[in-house]
Amino acid sequence: MSKIIVIGGGWSGVAASIRAAKRGAEVIICEKTDMLLGLGNVGGIMRNNGRYTATEECIALGGKELFEVTDKYTKHKGIDFPGHEHASIYNVTKIERPVRDLVRGMGIDVRFFNRVIDVELEGNKIRAVELEDGEKYMEMHL
């Protein structure tokens, strides 16, 4: 089984983690804060402009679980406002916990307050990552 460490639990890190877990990898997310989704907890905008197409492509490629959770917590769909067309807006106060439950339910190990401070290189490859508390992850796909 592959072991993968994902640095950062924002939308991209969560999506990458889900994909890796679905392919059979053992996955750890190192998140420096106390919650997932990062800046995704600020605006709550999903499926606007080009993101609509990207979302539908992601679903078609097997990434539906994350969007099913997002859709469940969407407050407004298909709205237009300056800079955004066809936007869906999810409830930023409610989305993080269900996403956390989803990834943990898939066997993904989420480690909060886990800041990566350094990487060790071997040539042009990452050999290990070092955490703020001194712990190192080695021999993983980073």
Place the predicted regions along the sequence by residue.
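Phosphate-coordination loops involved in phosphoryl transfer and adenosine-cofactor binding
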Residues: M1-K3, F113, E139
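Conserved N-terminal/central alpha/beta ligand/cofactor-binding core
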Residues: A25-E26, E31-D118, E122
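Conserved beta-strand-loop-beta-strand element in the redox core of flavoprotein oxidoreductases
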Residues: E120-M138
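Beta1/beta-strand and adjacent pyrophosphate-binding region of the FAD-binding site
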Residues: M1-S12
